């Protein structure tokens, strides 16, 4: 496919090129294709190559075949390219970028063998399509792969392998070029005779010219057949180092030019997509910013107007820009501030100086690939939020700025105004007809990204060109979306501090498969509604008048309590995605939020938990049949749990970073396939619907408190046994526990001893213990999960229950003994001491440990004790139980002696034998040794458990202190956006 034209022999080269190292080696060396002598050009250069000095501008003007290499500019000649760039596909960046763009040759030369010009109207459309970008700001750097030896343009960036091959990009770009070239060949069939006998329409598809590394002067128009080069480089893109253009010194000059080669920088980090003035049809690529004063030089364009635009070149540049935007490195993609779009700048307008440019900045383009960055579902493919790199600040900013544009679509809103709106904004759901751009991490109000989609100043684009471009891009790049998204490597992780944690929830929820955005008709529509491609699995948008306005209830709290924010959607399938703004007008963020029909009443003390009114069971069951939720990052969405029949109407409020596989809800111990060990509570209020307020004093509800702390607490009458609080936590790599804790406190059944007993009445304590033990026995079987550890909360609760029953039995027995017998005061004091210590132990430490056990099963409360914490606390509790047990054992000995007064005397005799231990008989020393061993064991146990207690208290204190600065590390590989 190489020998299309007969004039590809080598042209004579001047001797001054012999010492350069751009000499071509190999059979692929070809001579430049020079322009015909009849194709006159103005002597004024029309292309300002970046870093091209004045020496690069040839004063001689046009080149002709008759002149040959003798008409080369002073610094180089066409021979320098003849071989060096012979085998390239795209116009390669070479140091000798010429003063004019010879892609004009394929269509724009009036004398080119009887060819007719393109209509100026069509060329004007092309001029308006591509923004002026002569500042040299680097907008979209390609990610340079390891290929490419030598100090190339991209060698400054660290090589980073990409997951997709550049040949795929070339192939798709080639398809677009062929489409443009075919349409172009029908319009101008006779414009490419200079390269030989009537090359077919595809011959101009590569119609960007480049100058060789040796030609510092005028460029030589190498119009290589694009079809050939795409296949050629597909076959050898892995060994691109064989390119003869990569020789030695030729590479260090390549930054001075504006051309690309398909085997050069498609895979590099340093090749940036640049724009060009609409009147100057240079290549769309520039590698670097112009040096110093050259950036500010004014070059006059040729006066011929806008005839020089090649449709194939335009198509190639647009498709290349769009494709590179689609598949380039997302983390380096940013909107640069300095791009200036002059939609009216024709070739007659020169490039202005910086001060003039500052005055002339009227239009600021922001071009976004429309098939990738549409923000609303138009059906079809699976859309993803294209902000791959969502660092905490810019993630929120991007979510806030995504819908920042007013209805005119121009990105002129200041970031401060946008930041004021982000709290009432959703990250994915936008108007159907609004052109949205997901602004990459650094947002500047003046910005432009060259792309194949239309500029956001859509009023300047013609309808005809939009239709043609959308047809081509939609057909070519439509099938690419899912594969491109799969091929993109998501960054490793990002972390969100507590402030952005809250903001992400406030910023809105991103919908998943069956979560429809609530779309309403915008007040004014700019652009064409059908001109944005978005591939999302969601159904088509709801018609504007077919749904009620969204209803939302978002509660923002402190960072420690952000987990318990309730995001209560109203009932009905049309309201299932609540949004802070109705999106039915350009005044976004100013909507009055309409709450659910039964307005939820927040708790009077909101630092812990806010429980919203929840609709009845029938409604919840209907909702469960209608939908299934898959919450995602930045979302708190209520879901219906179907783990068991008695809890089927339970609602779950998933906080940020949680995404649950709904089809695995049958498993009690299901794992969340999402990220954070962040908290999320399933709250169900059973009974009276009006009693939606839960007084949560000192985080009692958060700690799962289901029993009274003191016997003197009055019974909360209105909240008696009316409802329960169900909680479930889903953490990554841990178990999900569901416990039902009846919140209302049962009245303490006082079974205290009537009559004048000096023993403190243990009735309230025992009644309270009975109540919470019953609750524990009721709630424990409901959890129904396989415990990963034998010594978990349930195991400790069972052990605690046995200990409590034993101690209560002893207390009751001693109290009956005190009532039945006339006991001396000393024995009564012992009984009071034992019973009082037991009551105190049961009312404080035992309840605390029971609360910790429930807390370990219910991680919605913060902090969640681990099994090691429970074991340490259990050992400490055993010391206290052991002390009480010794007192009861002493009382049992007194009872065995019929409560005689000599029992205390015997007890007094116990200490004296200790000093007489050496002189006592053998039997007594054995007893003393046993007592000493018991004491030693107790002391060792105390030391060991004190250390455990210190560790546990340190862990709890550190967890509590760090509650205000929680950092959630979200591995983005597991996160769906």
Curated annotation (Swiss-Prot):
Annotated positions of the Phosphoserine modification: 58, 404, 407, 410, 414, 641, 643, 930, 933, 965
Compositional bias of kind Gly residues: 74-87
UniProt biased composition (Basic and acidic residues): 1-10, 189-201, 767-777, 925-939
Biased composition (Low complexity): 53-73, 258-271
Tissue expression: Highly expressed in central and peripherical nervous system (at protein level).
Membrane-topology annotation of the record: Peripheral membrane protein
Compartment(s): Cell membrane; Postsynaptic density; Synapse
Bias kind Pro residues: ranges: 538-547
Protein name: Disks large-associated protein 3
Name of the gene encoding the protein in the UniProt record: Dlgap3
């Amino acid at each position: 496919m190489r020998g299309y034209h007969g004039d590809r022999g080598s042209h004579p080269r001047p001797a001054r090129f012999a010492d350069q190292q751009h000499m071509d080696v190999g059979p692929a060396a070809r001579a430049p294709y020079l322009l015909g002598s009849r194709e006159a050009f103005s002597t004024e250069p029309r292309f300002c190559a970046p870093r091209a000095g004045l020496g690069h501008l040839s004063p001689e003007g046009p080149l002709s075949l008759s002149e040959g290499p003798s008409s080369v500019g002073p610094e180089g000649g066409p021979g320098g390219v003849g071989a060096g760039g012979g085998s390239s596909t795209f116009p390669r960046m070479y140091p000798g970028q010429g003063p004019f763009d010879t892609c004009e040759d394929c269509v724009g030369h009036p004398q080119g063998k009887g060819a007719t010009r393109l209509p100026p109207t069509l060329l004007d459309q092309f001029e308006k399509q591509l923004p002026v970008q002569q500042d040299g700001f680097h907008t979209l750097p390609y990610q340079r792969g390891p290929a490419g030896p030598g100090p190339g343009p991209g060698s400054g960036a660290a090589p980073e392998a990409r997951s997709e091959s550049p040949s795929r990009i070339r192939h798709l770009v080639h398809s677009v070029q062929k489409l443009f070239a075919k349409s172009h060949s029908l319009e101008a069939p006779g414009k490419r005779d200079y390269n030989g006998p009537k090359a077919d329409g595809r011959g101009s598809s590569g119609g960007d010219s480049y100058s060789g590394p040796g030609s510092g002067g005028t460029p030589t128009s190498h119009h290589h057949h694009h079809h050939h080069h795409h296949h050629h480089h597909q076959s050898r893109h892995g060994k691109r180092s064989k390119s003869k253009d990569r020789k030695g010194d030729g590479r260090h000059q390549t930054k001075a030019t504006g051309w690309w080669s398909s085997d050069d920088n498609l895979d590099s980090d340093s090749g940036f997509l640049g724009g060009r003035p609409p009147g100057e049809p240079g290549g769309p690529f520039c590698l670097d910013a112009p040096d110093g004063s050259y950036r500010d030089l004014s070059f006059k364009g040729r006066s011929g107007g806008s005839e020089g635009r090649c449709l194939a070149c335009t198509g190639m540049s647009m498709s290349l820009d769009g494709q590179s935007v689609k598949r380039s490195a997302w983390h380096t993609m940013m909107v640069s501030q300095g791009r200036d779009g002059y939609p009216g700048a024709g070739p007659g307008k020169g490039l202005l100086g910086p001060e003039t440019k500052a005055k002339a900045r009227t239009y600021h383009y922001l071009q976004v690939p429309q098939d990738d960055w549409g923000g609303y579902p138009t059906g079809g493919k699976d859309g993803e939020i294209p902000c791959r790199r969502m660092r905490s600040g810019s993630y929120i900013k991007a979510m806030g700025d995504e819908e920042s544009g007013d209805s005119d679509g121009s990105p002129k809103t200041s970031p401060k105004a946008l930041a004021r709106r982000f709290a009432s904004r959703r990250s994915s759901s936008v108007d159907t007809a609004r052109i949205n751009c997901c602004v990459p991490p650094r947002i500047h109000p003046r910005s432009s990204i060259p792309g194949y989609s239309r500029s956001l100043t859509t009023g300047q684009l013609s309808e005809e060109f939009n239709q043609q471009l959308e047809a081509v891009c939609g057909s070519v790049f439509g099938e690419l979306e899912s594969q491109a998204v799969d091929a993109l490597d998501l960054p490793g992780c990002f972390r969100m501090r507590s402030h952005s944690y809250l903001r992400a929830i406030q910023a809105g929820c991103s919908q998943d498969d069956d979560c429809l955005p609530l779309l309403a008709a915008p007040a004014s529509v700019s652009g064409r509604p059908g001109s944005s491609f978005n591939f999302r699995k969601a159904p088509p948008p709801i018609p504007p008048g077919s749904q009620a306005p969204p209803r939302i209830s978002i509660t923002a709290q402190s960072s420690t309590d952000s987990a318990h924010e309730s995001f209560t959607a109203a009932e009905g399938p049309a309201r299932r995605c609540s949004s802070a703004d109705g999106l039915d007008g350009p005044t976004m963020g100013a909507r009055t939020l309409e709450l659910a029909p039964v307005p939820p009443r927040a708790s009077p003390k909101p630092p812990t938990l806010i429980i919203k009114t929840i609709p009845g069971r029938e409604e919840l069951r209907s909702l469960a049949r209608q939908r299934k939720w898959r919450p995602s990052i930045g979302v708190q969405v209520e879901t219906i749990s179907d783990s068991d029949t008695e809890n089927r109407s339970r609602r779950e409020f998933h906080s940020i970073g949680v995404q649950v596989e709904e089809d695995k809800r049958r498993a009690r111990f299901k794992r969340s396939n999402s990220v954070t060990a962040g908290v999320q509570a399933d709250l169900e209020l059973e009974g009276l619907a009006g009693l939606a307020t839960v007084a949560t004093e000192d985080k009692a509800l958060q700690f799962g408190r289901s029993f009274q702390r003191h016997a003197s607490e009055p019974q909360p009458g209105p909240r008696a046994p009316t409802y329960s609080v169900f909680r479930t936590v889903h953490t990554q790599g841990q178990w999900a526990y569901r416990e039902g804790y009846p919140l209302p406190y049962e009245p303490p059944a006082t079974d205290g001893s009537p009559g004048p007993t000096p023993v403190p009445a243990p009735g309230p304590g025992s009644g309270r213990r009975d109540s919470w033990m019953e609750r524990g026995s009721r709630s424990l079987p409901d959890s129904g999960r396989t415990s990963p550890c034998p010594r978990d909360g349930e195991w400790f609760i069972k052990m605690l229950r046995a200990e409590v029953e034993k101690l209560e039995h002893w207390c009751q027995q001693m109290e009956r003994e005190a009532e039945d017998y006339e006991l001396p005061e000393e024995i009564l004091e012992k009984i009071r001491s034992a019973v009082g210590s037991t009551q105190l132990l049961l009312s404080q430490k035992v309840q605390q440990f029971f609360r910790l056990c429930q807390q370990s099963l219910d991680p919605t409360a913060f902090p969640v004790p681990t099994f090691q914490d429970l074991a340490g606390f259990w050992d400490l509790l055993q010391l206290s139980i052991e002390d009480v047990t010794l007192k009861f054992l002493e009382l049992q000995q007194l009872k065995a002696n019929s409560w005689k007064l000599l029992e205390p005397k015997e007890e007094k005799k116990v200490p004296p034998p200790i000093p007489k231990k050496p002189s006592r008989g053998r039997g007594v020393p054995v007893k003393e040794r046993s007592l000493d061993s018991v004491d030693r064991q107790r002391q060792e146990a105390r030391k060991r458990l004190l250390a455990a207690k210190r560790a546990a208290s340190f862990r709890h204190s550190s967890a509590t202190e760090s509650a205000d600065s929680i950092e959630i590390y979200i591995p983005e590989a597991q996160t769906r956006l």
